């Protein structure tokens, strides 16, 4: 139920963790501007943390995503610039460029190993404490890859046989098949293979692909049947978890409800 985090998504975790690590290591100082390329949730989360800590925040986003994501970052006082169309590739290039300039710090969520560390050392451990039995499989959508790789690593430390499955839209299975297409599951499959996945692809045991329309239908069902108001990626995650549980005959499968539904009113 990571949609219940401050800022409304799972990304609140890495935002706090990465910014505080940067402070401790002297990479981020008073008066600096944090700059991040994001399809929305990490930008929202880092804008929230920047507001609390008194940093300026610049979010670089592609066009074509929900306007609520833009509005939330601005509500926290961040500047938002739109670069490119739907995929974050161009925004990422600009983020890397600015991150080298004096007075800027770029966490670089898609490449930074701190992303994996937070999910392994914190989120993964929290989930393990709540599980009634050892996890047999974790499935997570790949935005940065930090969540599914990090949590999978934590799970394999207590059950070497646990499997890690990566979720992608069936219209844009970038990692598994090299395809880059538009889709409606915002927050995953951003149009390229993240550095985290390039380094840790050997830790992925399998892939599952869910269509955008299935995901949105499931999102609506979750709200109407369970009273849980989440976004399309949560619908995709639940379908994937149920499918893998049945196909592989497993008892304990873990997945994530990543963000709140308020960002996707047009889809409801």
Model-derived features: positions:
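PLP-dependent amino-acid enzyme catalytic core
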Residues: 1-268
